[in-house]
């Protein structure tokens, strides 16, 4: 039986405030570790080389969202690791995603992994992470580099292979102490988080409704815990024009790229920093040859917003922009044709009293264990924790690696963060599972 150590809580306001005023969140000033918790920390210290080697093996399996084979390989590895700890594992499939673009077609989604321990413990805990990264198979950034000063550089080291390795090894530390016996715990690894969890959202919501608390092992930066997040949306535009020789028959063409240029200018005007709304045309393509009037153009757009109403307003604005054609050619009155697709894929993650309690405990424990969490932040980035909390599951995210440079070849973290966060995760999981 796991015994909770006595805790004396004295509520104080945070001295560090990041990206907005924070009030009413208490910090546990006094904490002590139980004998079992100390033994878990010792286990992590003893297995540092093993944990680092596992991180390298995880990072060097390419799991770009479109690399189904790589994701299948990684899922099988995770399934084996969890089965060794006594979990029952099951895969869940998603329908392919239709892509509105000049090339068209569908994006195949790799199967997701759900692992469960079904005991009689009262508190039902859901922990989750995503297997996919933004790095494709042909990206040059494919390996983990361990530098002499302990800096780790590699694809997904912070987002979020590091978080997964932390999670697995924290569970291993609990397993050695017998602290996974008779618990109610579900682990979810999805394969499409980097494209908005479009295929896995229903599964995430269903599982969230069956649990009492959620923990997400996404990374963070500057040792800050994420208290609230913006909502996220995405949109696609496709313009169909008419190809023609740009020299001999320019007048017979209808430029899809010209029409799209007008669209992008209007879309970018939707950014309003004062309202905390941003819009970014992240991917833009048009035409195939220099000497041909482009017959097709497409754009892939990102939206960030502070409220559901603001997100819905963005959706409507993009649809209105798509409905107004600017380029004209009297010979072809039905062209250009503009199509749009929008989705609000991440709800706003608001402050939550239960989550604040978990953050306060995490801050106190981290100060005791090492690499303390020094404050909180409001983030414009998204996680699946936004989805779980939107359906009623209090969810703390940002329990993974402290790092920087995510989604770029500069992505990095540290060995210190890997080990310290594994210790913190082990203690926090033990306490949540045995409440």
Each language-model region and where it sits:
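Bacterial N-terminal signal peptides that target proteins for export
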Residues: 1-12
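Bacterial N-terminal signal peptides
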Residues: 10-21
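Sec/Tat signal peptide C-region and signal peptidase I cleavage site
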Residues: 24-28
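Acidic-glycine-rich active-site phosphate/pyrophosphate-binding loop
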Residues: 132-148, 228-238, 364, 401
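Acidic/histidine-rich catalytic neighborhood of metal-dependent amide-processing enzymes
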Residues: 160-234, 272, 433-434
């Amino acid at each position: 039986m796991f015994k909770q150590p006595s805790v004396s809580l004295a509520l104080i306001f945070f001295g560090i405030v990041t990206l907005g005023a924070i009030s009413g969140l208490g910090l546990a000033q006094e904490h002590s570790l139980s004998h079992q918790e100390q033994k878990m920390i010792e286990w992590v210290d003893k297995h540092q080389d093993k944990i680092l080697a596992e991180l390298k093996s995880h990072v060097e399996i390419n799991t770009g969202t479109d690399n189904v084979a790589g994701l299948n390989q990684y899922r099988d590895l995770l399934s084996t690791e969890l089965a060794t700890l006594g979990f029952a594992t099951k895969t869940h499939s998603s329908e392919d995603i239709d892509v509105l673009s000049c090339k068209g077609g569908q994006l195949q989604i790799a199967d997701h992994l759900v692992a469960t321990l079904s005991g009689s413990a009262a508190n039902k805990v859901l922990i989750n992470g995503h297997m996919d990264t933004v790095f494709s198979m042909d990206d040059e950034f494919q390996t983990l580099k361990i530098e002499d000063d302990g800096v780790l550089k590699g694809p997904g080291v912070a987002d979020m292979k590091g978080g997964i390795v932390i999670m697995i090894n924290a569970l291993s530390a609990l397993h050695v102490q017998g602290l996974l016996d008779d618990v109610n715990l579900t682990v979810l690894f999805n394969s499409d988080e980097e494209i908005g969890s479009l295929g896995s959202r229903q599964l995430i919501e269903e599982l969230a409704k069956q649990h009492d608390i959620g923990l997400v092992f996404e990374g963070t930066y500057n040792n800050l815990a994420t208290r609230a997040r913006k909502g996220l949306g995405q949109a696609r535009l496709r313009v169909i024009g008419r190809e023609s020789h740009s020299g001999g028959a320019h007048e017979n063409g209808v430029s899809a790229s010209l029409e799209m240029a007008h669209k992008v200018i209007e879309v970018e005007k939707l950014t309003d920093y004062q309202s905390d709304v941003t819009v970014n045309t992240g991917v833009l393509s048009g035409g195939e040859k220099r000497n041909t009037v482009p017959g097709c153009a497409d754009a892939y757009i990102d939206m960030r917003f502070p409220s559901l109403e603001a997100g819905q307003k963005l959706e409507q604005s993009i649809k209105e922009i798509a409905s107004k054609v600017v380029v004209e050619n009297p010979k072809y009155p039905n062209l250009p044709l503009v199509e749009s697709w929008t989705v609000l894929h991440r709800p706003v993650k608001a402050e939550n009293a239960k989550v604040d309690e978990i953050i306060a405990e995490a801050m106190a424990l981290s100060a005791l264990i090492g690499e303390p969490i020094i404050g909180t932040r409001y983030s414009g980035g998204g996680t699946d924790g936004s989805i779980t909390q939107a359906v009623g599951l209090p969810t703390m995210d940002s329990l993974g690696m402290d790092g920087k440079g995510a989604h770029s070849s500069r992505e990095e973290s540290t060995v210190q963060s890997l080990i310290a966060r594994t210790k913190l995760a082990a203690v926090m999981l033990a306490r949540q599972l045995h409440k």
